[in-house]
């Protein structure tokens, strides 16, 4: 057993307190994710204005729409897909975004679905671009580049918050014994960090490679969608399935099933992008 294995015993997920409000590292990590994505996008606009002919003010307005769509979609998606008491929230809709518990204590909003956030993002992007759909693919490509590195901070936030834990490390896994984290007296894979690397860093490199080798608008978001789906599918083998969900057909987790649907959506965007490139 090394110091890394027991890091959760030595780490407080609460960064600091403001009166009765506890600020978690989780929240700070997500703030870093948003800031990273925002400035990464601005850098791309400045560096490649021909590919991303968007004014800063225009992008700032779009970014607000996209963020709102992501938050709404992620939270509602979690309620519909993962929340065992979804019927309660559907009849008490205001509770979906209530950051206080029954005692009035600030606990934040917990329970977000990445795939739900993706749906919300696509809807928000379409609504914002509906008056000029020619810009839709430009916006999507821009987010495809700026999102992955921000996503890394999001998964680090999950790790610091000690949630979305990994599967139990087999006793015969030498690497697992080294990188595993003790959770409830069981050594588990640090699945959040595995996801940060695969779904963040690797997907970012995929999109940057595509940016270098293609000029067709819409292909970057397609590469992102397909790359993320593949990396998430792999990472799910190290992540403990949600206790209320378990596994399904062929022992696939809900995350893997939703990633397969994401492939279909990505191929649909590919058809749309290919069709528009010929106009």
UniProtKB/Swiss-Prot annotation:
Q: Which Pfam families match?
A: LGT (PF01790)
Q: Where are the transmembrane segments?
A: 14-34, 62-82, 106-126, 136-156, 190-210, 218-238, 252-272
Question: Which keywords are on file for this protein?
Answer: Cell inner membrane, Cell membrane, Membrane, Transferase, Transmembrane, Transmembrane helix
Q: Which domain of life is it from?
A: Bacteria
Top EC category: transferase
Q: Where does a 1,2-diacyl-sn-glycero-3-phospho-(1'-sn-glycerol) bind?
A: 155
Question: Which cell locations does it reside in?
Answer: Cell inner membrane
Tell me the Gene Ontology biological-process terms attached to this UniProt entry.
Answer: lipoprotein biosynthetic process
Per the record, GO CC terms? plasma membrane
Pathway connected to this protein: Protein modification; lipoprotein biosynthesis (diacylglyceryl transfer)
Do you know which PROSITE patterns this protein is assigned to?
LGT
* E.C. designation(s): 2.5.1.145
Question: How does the record classify its membrane topology?
Answer: Multi-pass membrane protein
Q: Name one molecular function that GO assigns to this entry.
A: phosphatidylglycerol-prolipoprotein diacylglyceryl transferase activity
Tell me, what does this protein do in biology? Catalyzes the transfer of the diacylglyceryl group from phosphatidylglycerol to the sulfhydryl group of the N-terminal cysteine of a prolipoprotein, the first step in the formation of mature lipoproteins.
**Protein family membership:** Belongs to the Lgt family.
Q: What is this protein called?
A: Phosphatidylglycerol--prolipoprotein diacylglyceryl transferase
| Gene that this polypeptide is encoded by | lgt
């Amino acid at each position: 057993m090394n110091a890394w294995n027991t890091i959760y015993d030595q780490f407080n997920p609460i960064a600091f307190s403001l009166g009765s409000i506890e600020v978690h590292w989780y929240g700070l990590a997500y703030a870093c994710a948003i800031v990273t994505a925002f400035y990464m996008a601005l850098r791309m606009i400045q560096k490649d204005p021909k590919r991303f002919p968007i004014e800063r003010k225009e992008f700032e307005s779009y970014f607000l729409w996209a963020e709102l769509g992501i938050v709404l979609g992620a939270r509602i998606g979690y309620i519909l897909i993962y929340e065992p008491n979804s019927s309660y929230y559907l009849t008490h809709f205001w509770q979906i975004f209530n950051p206080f518990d029954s005692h009035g204590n600030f606990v934040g909003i917990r329970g977000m679905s990445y795939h739900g956030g993706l749906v919300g993002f696509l809807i928000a992007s379409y609504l914002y671009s509906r008056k000029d759909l020619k810009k839709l693919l430009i916006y999507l490509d821009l987010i495809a580049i700026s999102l992955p590195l921000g996503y890394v901070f999001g998964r680090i936030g999950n790790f610091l918050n000690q949630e979305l834990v990994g599967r139990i490390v087999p006793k015969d896994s030498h690497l697992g014994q080294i990188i595993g984290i003790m959770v409830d007296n069981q050594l588990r894979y640090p699945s959040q960090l595995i996801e940060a690397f695969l779904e963040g860093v690797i997907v970012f490199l995929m999109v940057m490679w595509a940016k270098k080798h293609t000029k067709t608008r819409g292909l970057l978001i397609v590469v992102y969608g397909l790359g993320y789906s593949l990396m998430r599918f792999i990472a799910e083998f190290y992540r403990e399935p949600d206790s209320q969900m378990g596994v399904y057909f062929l022992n696939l987790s809900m995350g893997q099933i939703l990633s397969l649907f994401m492939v279909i959506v990505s191929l649909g965007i590919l058809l749309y992008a290919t069709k528009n490139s010929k106009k």
